[in-house]
């Protein structure tokens, strides 16, 4: 009661409350400042990652001259046509009225191919005898392969941090179609007199090693090695080939500006539908025979373009 009446005590209580409030405000200020610094650091890291994984460091100046589509006038076999780039190529070839067949695995999801009315033959590319049978029973004149390991094939999907913590999960190379599967297809194509072979592969192989950003090169070193073996096997086969190497690709809309260049240091991202356009254009372009190209889109140099449109 005395303290309530004593003005000095009331004044002391007032300043004590003020001091507590100021302390809380200081704490809040520190938290907000820390969040601000964290946000700035996050933006810096994301921006740095995008720049490091961009194609801004080298600009090609020469490109394959564009040409109108020319039909091969024979039966076309596509491998890897159930999804991604392969499926986009299927759609483009159907639009051109081509006689098209897709080779699929027994476990493949063929729903989209069936809806499109695409003829299908079943074989596991890793089993040479099955591939040979498919080729010997059909008179294919042209082969397009987008065959490779999909994320579903991997024993475990990992990001960079998980790989660091748990150790990188590797897949048995003998169970990956990137080399063995493509080798079996190339050999069967050669044995049955195929006229033309289009191979969709990745930037980072052979002379394009330095074009791939270092982080991507490290993360995909296993598949790059296998794809490079497949490329070399195709070159040595004697088939009339065109090799098209890709950087990252997206499901975004076509920019209409993608081109093929023999400049092996060129790197960009690219829409799958643009890859399909480049592949079927190269099919009938004699200037592309027995050559290796990087797919390049000047509007898709930065990683974030993969997630736009």
Place the predicted regions along the sequence by residue.
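Membrane-interface motif at the C-terminal end of an N-terminal transmembrane signal
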Residues: 45-62
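N-terminal Rossmann NAD(P)H-binding glycine-rich loop of SDR-like oxidoreductase domains
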Residues: 76-98
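Active-site-lining helix/loop region of Rossmann-like oxidoreductase modules
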Residues: 70, 81, 249-309
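N-terminal Sec-pathway targeting helices
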Residues: 22-41
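Conserved cofactor-binding/catalytic machinery of classical short-chain dehydrogenase/reductase
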Residues: 127, 181, 230, 271-274
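NAD(P)H-binding glycine-rich loop region in Rossmannoid oxidoreductase-like domains
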Residues: 76-77, 102-191, 284
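Glycine-/Pro-rich loop/turn segments that contact NAD(P) or position catalytic residues
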Residues: 149-261
């Amino acid at each position: 009661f005395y303290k309530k009446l004593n003005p000095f005590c009331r004044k002391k209580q007032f300043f004590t409350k003020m001091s507590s409030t100021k302390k809380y405000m200081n704490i809040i200020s520190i938290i907000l400042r820390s969040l601000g610094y964290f946000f700035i650091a996050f933006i810096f890291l994301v921006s740095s990652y995008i720049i490091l994984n961009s194609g801004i460091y080298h600009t090609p100046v020469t490109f394959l001259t564009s040409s109108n589509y020319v039909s091969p006038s024979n039966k076309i076999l596509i491998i890897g046509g159930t999804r991604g780039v392969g499926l986009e190529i299927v759609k483009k070839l159907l639009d051109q009225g081509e006689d098209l067949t897709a080779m699929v695995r027994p476990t493949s999801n063929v729903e989209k191919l069936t809806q499109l009315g695409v003829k299908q033959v079943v074989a596991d590319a890793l089993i040479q005898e099955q591939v040979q049978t498919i080729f010997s029973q059909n008179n294919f004149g042209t082969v397009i392969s987008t065959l490779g390991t999909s994320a579903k094939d991997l024993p475990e999907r990992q990001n960079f941090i998980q790989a660091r913590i748990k150790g990188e999960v590797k897949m048995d190379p003998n169970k990956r179609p990137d080399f063995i599967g493509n080798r079996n297809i190339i050999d069967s194509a050669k044995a049955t007199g195929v006229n033309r072979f289009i191979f969709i592969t990745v930037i980072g192989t052979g002379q394009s090693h330095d074009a791939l950003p270092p982080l991507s090169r490290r993360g995909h070193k296993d598949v790059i090695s296998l794809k490079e073996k497949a490329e070399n096997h195709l070159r040595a086969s004697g088939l009339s080939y065109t090799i098209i190497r890709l950087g990252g690709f997206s499901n975004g809309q076509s920019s209409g500006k993608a081109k093929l260049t023999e400049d092996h240091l060129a790197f960009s991202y690219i829409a799958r539908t643009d890859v399909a356009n480049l592949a079927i254009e190269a099919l009938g372009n004699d200037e592309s025979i027995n050559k290796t190209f990087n797919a390049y889109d000047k509007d898709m140099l930065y990683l974030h373009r993969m997630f736009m449109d």
